[in-house]
Swiss-Prot record:
Cross-referenced Pfam families: ATP-synt_ab, ATP-synt_ab_N, ATP-synt_VA_C
NCBIfam families in UniProt: PRK04196.1, V-ATPase_V1_B
Single GO cellular component term: vacuolar membrane
Residues the record lists as N-acetylglycine modifications: 2
GO terms under biological process: ATP metabolic process
Membrane topology: Peripheral membrane protein
Subcellular location(s) of the protein: Vacuole membrane
Full protein name: V-type proton ATPase subunit B2
Cited HAMAP family: ATP_synth_B_arch (MF_00310)
GO molecular function, one term: ATP binding
InterPro entries attached to this UniProt entry: ATP-synt_VA_C, ATPase_a/bsu_AS, ATPase_F1/V1/A1_a/bsu_N, ATPase_F1/V1/A1_a/bsu_nucl-bd, ATPase_V1-cplx_bsu, P-loop_NTPase, V-ATPase_su_B/beta
SUPFAM superfamilies named among the record's database cross-references: P-loop containing nucleoside triphosphate hydrolases (SSF52540)
Length: 487
């Protein structure tokens, strides 16, 4: 029993229950037990193999004296003759502490950076605490990423959940690392209209969870965080591609439980980045298939919408608590298909999306963010006078309109030729080219604060005469149209 007790690092002190040697079958990551007295849903079990090694599992299904257990470390080597199972009577909990900042953990929450063990300040259920909906506070105030297309046109509010829709071969990992390097709190302005500080204060933290990534990607994130000095405010959870698939189901929940502790108990504003949610959905499908459930679209379980919501809805702010949790899940769309169940259901739950475009990437534009299908539904509450600048919303609307018209003119040019275009059409083509080369494109280590991005946007809008800027009020044009961009 000592070996099993040593394997309970995540649960703390538990009352070990009875041992059973009643394994009746193994199906994929699942173990079926019979003649079990009083098993409980989501109860943690300790599994000891014939060679003395121990593993952990969780009860997925209960039917009388029959229990189905998912094994986090995989079912290889489990037999029905020598394997014993202990029921702990506890749900899965993870140790949390402020000391987790600057540390690297595996997908189960165990340190893998050769550092000292974490001295937990609490053990929390990885499913999270239930939040009274009436106590939620509307997300306000902007998180500055330093990326112009996000900050100006898809501003992220503190407490928002907004995914990155990407695909295989696109630089979503580089964009995620850049956001981690550059993201910070934006100070609410009093009456100043020209001074905004990118704050690197102690109140901001990042929880990064990688699911199903290869070793190269894991090393990229570890090296990037350590080299640029942002590691001290990052907690990193890594579930590698060769780790058990079933572990991917608990990795985002452990990460979010850590984020909830940092936000609601330590008062920090936490940015949670989850990559890759497509790997999480595939793990969910694997468990569903092993349980022989009726499949939904493309083999994914019918409850995947509900399951994803239990992750995404843990973002937000709570009345009376200083901290907040902002989520940026990253998912890769198979075959660039935005109608795939994972991005489709994610889009229903989250508050917008940021779309990474393959055509822009093929033209060597980084970050290849296509602003037209991108959207931030809570942007209006995070910008404007007192938050960023009074012209922010109008500039964003005008950029969207002119870029959309420019794309239409570009398509028309391919049909009728440049000679058939009007002088006004040529202005939109000029704007289209400069917008993508100067505004969308920026270096991976190029940080632009919100004022630099807005002034750059005005430089592009000055391509047009005032009378063509229909979405900007005359009062705003009077103040900004002819202003020197050097402030």
């Amino acid at each position: 029993m000592g070996a099993a007790e040593n394997n309970l690092e995540m649960e703390g002190t538990l009352e070990i229950g009875m041992e059973y040697r009643t394994v009746s079958g193994v199906a994929g990551p699942l173990v079926i037990l019979e003649k079990v007295k009083g098993p409980k849903y989501q109860e943690i079990v300790n599994i000891r193999l014939g060679d003395g090694t121990t593993r952990r599992g969780q009860v997925l299904e209960v039917d009388g004296e029959k229990a189905v257990v998912q094994v986090f470390e995989g079912t290889s080597g489990i037999d029905n003759k020598y394997t014993t199972v202990q029921f702990t009577g506890e749900v899965l909990k993870t140790p949390v502490s402020l000391d987790m900042l600057g540390r690297i953990f595996n997908g189960s929450g165990k340190p893998i950076d050769n550092g000292p063990p974490i001295l937990p300040e609490a053990y929390l259920d990885i499913s999270g605490s239930s939040i009274n909906p009436s106590e939620r506070t509307y997300p306000e105030e902007m998180i500055q990423t330093g990326i112009s297309t996000i900050d100006v046109m898809n501003s992220i509010a503190r407490g928002q959940k907004i995914p990155l829709f990407s695909a295989a071969g696109l630089p979503h990992n580089e964009i995620a690392a850049q956001i981690c390097r550059q993201a910070g709190l934006v100070k609410r302005l009093e009456k100043s209209d020209n001074l905004l500080e990118h704050q690197e204060d102690d109140n901001f933290a990042i929880v990064f969870a990688a699911m199903g990534v290869n070793m190269e990607t894991a090393q990229f994130f570890k090296r990037d965080f350590e080299e640029n000095g942002s590691m001290e405010r990052v907690t990193l959870f890594l579930n590698l591609a060769n780790d058990p698939t079933i572990e991917r189901i608990i990795t985002p929940r452990i990460a979010l439980t850590t984020a909830e502790y940092l936000a609601y108990e330590c008062g920090k504003h936490v940015l949670v980045i989850l990559t890759d949610m497509s790997s999480y959905a595939d793990a969910l499908r694997e468990v569903s298939a092993a349980r022989e459930e009726v499949p939904g679209r493309r083999g994914y379980p019918g409850y995947m919408y509900t399951d994803l919501a239990t992750i995404y809805e843990r973002a937000g702010r709570i009345e009376g608590r200083k901290g907040s949790i902002t989520q940026i899940p990253i998912l890769t769309m198979p075959n660039d298909d935005i109608t795939h169940p994972t991005p489709d259901l994610t889009g229903y739950i989250t508050e917008g999306q940021i779309y990474i475009d393959r055509q822009l990437h093929n033209r060597q534009i980084y970050p290849p963010i296509n602003v037209l299908p991108s959207l931030s539904r809570l942007m209006k509450s995070a910008i404007g006078e007192g938050m960023t600048r009074r012209d922010h919303s109008d500039v964003s609307n005008q950029l969207y309109a002119n870029y959309a018209i420019g794309k239409d003119v570009q398509a028309m040019k391919a049909v009728v030729g440049e000679e058939a275009l009007s002088s006004e059409d040529l202005l939109y083509l000029e704007f289209l080219d400069k917008f993508e080369r100067k505004f969308v494109a920026q270096g991976a280590y190029d940080t632009r604060n919100i004022f630099q991005s807005l002034d750059l946007a005005w430089t592009l809008l000055r391509i047009f005469p005032r009378e063509l800027l229909h979405r900007i009020p005359a009062k705003t044009l009077d103040q900004f149209y002819s202003r020197d961009t050097t402030n």
